[in-house]
């Protein structure tokens, strides 16, 4: 997956593990991902969550005839982070013919849960 000139590149998101069972992505907490008060921006967490779900879903579709696009995402931000790296772990909870649903947990460097997200992806024909 080419991440050049994408939101992923702009936010420093990297996919570090990607299988049908789970996708792990990491993102720095730095000047690109914080809000004006210096805390990790909730929108950056949501971008990380959707990235992990979308990347993971690539293992579950037929690339010759199908593509996955975001349909819905929500997030509960549980703790704040001011520095370091955050890690998203996305696991599928529903793999259907037309939708795939992931739950995503985001952790800080101390392995504290900072965000819980659910992302629904539509499986569409190319």
From Swiss-Prot:
Its EC number is 3.1.2.-. One of its GO terms (cellular component) is cytosol. InterPro entries: HotDog_dom_sf, PAAI_dom, Thioestr_dom. One of its GO terms (molecular function) is 1,4-dihydroxy-2-naphthoyl-CoA thioesterase activity. Keywords: Hydrolase. Pfam families: 4HBT. Is not required for competence. Belongs to the thioesterase PaaI family. This is Putative esterase ComA2.
